């Protein structure tokens, strides 16, 4: 028994030395209310997102009032046009004074940009394109009207 008491005292605390840790009662944290927000997509379907209820400033809605008219001469100017789109500015691109290969590359680059930003690109004339960010909605089509009036 003496040996077992030595093991107990070595590995375990003696009854006199036992330490009890009292748990401090925490105050419950207030829960944030989750709200479901309907977000319209391009196909007029509604995607439901769950997000925290927060107050957001409406400064983003003011960016849609800017429009940039551009007539690039080289492919390197496509990045500047993409930066305008990232800043929520509508861009009208006239590609009539650039080679066909360069124009194709610019349209491909801008198509990828507007896709990534959730925007849209439309042909509005012969080598003229309208690129819009996601906060701009375009109704109608000029190309169809031009075809009807034989302008092309």
From Swiss-Prot:
Key word Cell cycle present: yes
Query: Which residues lie in Basic and acidic residues bias regions?
Result: 23-32
Q: Which InterPro entries does UniProt cross-reference here?
A: Cell_div_SepF, Cell_div_SepF/SepF-rel, SepF-like_sf
Please give a single GO biological process term from the UniProt record. FtsZ-dependent cytokinesis
Q: Where is this region: Disordered?
A: 23-42
Subunit description: Homodimer. Interacts with FtsZ.
Q: What is this protein called?
A: Cell division protein SepF
Q: Which organism is it from?
A: Listeria welshimeri serovar 6b (strain ATCC 35897 / DSM 20650 / CCUG 15529 / CIP 8149 / NCTC 11857 / SLCC 5334 / V8)
């Amino acid at each position: 028994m003496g040996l077992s008491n030595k093991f107990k005292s070595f590995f375990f605390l003696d009854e006199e030395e036992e330490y009890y840790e009292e748990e401090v009662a925490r105050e419950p944290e207030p829960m944030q209310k989750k709200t479901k927000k309907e977000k319209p997509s391009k196909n007029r379907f509604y995607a439901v997102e769950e997000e925290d209820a927060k107050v957001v400033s409406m400064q983003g809605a003011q960016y849609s009032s800017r429009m940039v008219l551009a007539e690039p001469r080289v492919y390197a100017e496509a990045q500047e046009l993409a930066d305008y789109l990232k800043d929520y500015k509508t861009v009208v691109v006239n590609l009539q004074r650039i080679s066909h290969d360069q124009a194709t590359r610019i349209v491909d680059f801008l198509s990828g940009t507007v896709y990534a930003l959730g925007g849209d690109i439309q042909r509005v004339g012969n080598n003229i394109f309208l690129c819009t960010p996601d906060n701009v909605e375009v109704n109608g089509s000029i190309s169809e009207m031009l075809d009807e009036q034989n302008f092309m």
